[in-house]
């Protein structure tokens, strides 16, 4: 199967939120996932929303996620990826910092940091 000009072994991947800080993506490839997405990554480190931030709706059999993009920031994440080359198709989910004054610039900062 080919996606974005890259061959992947299968269409089953791991979405952003599982490996928020790009710590285990190569292990996920070894488990057999066809692609992995890390993040969400913001320009600078942030801790996310205060707890509680995950809520269970038993009647609806659902969860509400209000984690708030807790992550180590683009500098550390970029360093990790550069020093631990992905063994598969790696996506990077980017987002703005919670208290930013310019959300568009936050996206551009991350895009410039990771696009290579």
Language-model region placement:
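N-terminal amphipathic alpha-helix/helix-capping segment at the start of soluble metabolic enzymes
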Residues: 1-14, 76-86
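Active-site cofactor/substrate anionic-group-binding motifs, chiefly glycine-
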Residues: 8, 13, 24-44
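Hydrophobic faces of well-ordered beta-strands that scaffold small-molecule active sites
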Residues: 12-16, 34-38, 65, 77, ...
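Active-site beta-loop-alpha junctions enriched in small/polar residues
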Residues: 17-19, 41, 95-99
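Short alpha-helical segments and helix-capping/turn motifs at coil-helix boundaries
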Residues: 19-28, 76
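Acidic (Asp/Glu)-rich catalytic clusters
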Residues: 29-30, 80-87, 112-116
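A gly/proline- and charged-residue-enriched helix-loop-helix capping module
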Residues: 39-89
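Alpha/beta enzyme core
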Residues: 101-116
């Amino acid at each position: 199967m080919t996606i974005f000009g890259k061959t992947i072994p299968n269409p089953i991947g791991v979405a952003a939120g599982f490996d928020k800080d790009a710590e285990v993506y190569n292990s996920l490839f070894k488990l057999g996932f066809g692609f992995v997405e890390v993040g969400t990554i913001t320009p600078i480190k942030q801790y996310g929303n205060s707890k509680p931030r995950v809520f269970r709706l038993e009647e609806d059999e659902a969860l509400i996620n209000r984690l708030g993009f807790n992550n180590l920031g683009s500098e550390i994440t970029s360093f990790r990826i550069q020093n631990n080359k992905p063994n598969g198709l790696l996506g990077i989910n980017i987002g703005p910092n919670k208290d930013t004054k310019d959300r568009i610039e936050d996206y551009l900062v991350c895009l410039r940091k990771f696009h290579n």
